[in-house]
Amino acid sequence: MDSRLTIVDVTGSTNDDLLEAGKQGAPHGTGLAARAQTAGRGRRGHKWDSSAGNLLLSIVLRPCVNPAKYSGLAAVSGLAVLEALEKQGLANEIRLKWPNDLVARGHKLGGILVEAARDNEGKPFAVCGIGVNVNYVPSEVPDGGLPAIGLSDLNENVPAIDVLLKEVYHAVVSAVDAWADLLNATEENAGPLAPVHGQYVAHLNWIGEHVIARSPAGDELARGIFKTVDAFGRACIETEGGLRSFHFEEASLRPLSE
């Protein structure tokens, strides 16, 4: 196991722990995994069931890019998690769901939470939290959410969680480093997803399908065909009135059939 990656039995939230460590100057690539969390959370503060038996990992990231580009980190990390699972022969049915989930068979397999902050010297950093259901599948379905599924439901032979942790950890750090290098080689006004845009869209769920965009409060914002996600991370929907784009803080998507 990499010396930068620490595994503990239980903590409140690995993201909270590393946000504090990051403020104290923890370096790029500092990783913390837990067997269980008592206060795990996802996007918009939703509770993340973090019982034992699943992959729970957070990583301090200090990519050498304009922090305004940090909005690309969730997509880059999601692709990296897919790559790590693919190396273990586990990714055949897994797709990315905009903006930050892993899904399979219409169920939620995992999620990614990226939180940006500044350390005590004013330097920017981010913490990327990754949760993947492996052996334990939460039974509770959040309002407007998808039911859960685990890697053990998709595959007969799932490696030990520590093996998966190592693969995911190294994949994410390597992917972020490569993304930062490529982003710095592009035009200054390029979108944060520019270096991985084609790859990201190719792995997205529901592209070309009819979807509904809903606000955080559950109100319908638009319905139409999910065309793509642009290089700035906005979901683009072709509606009867024309193309509309939504930032991840504005909306979430669901298939129209639901």
Where are the model-predicted features located?
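N-terminal lobe of the biotin/lipoate ligase/transferase fold
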Residues: 1-91, 108-110, 115-118, 256-257
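Long, positively charged amphipathic alpha-helical accessory segments at protein N-termini or as interdomain linkers
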Residues: 71-93, 104-258
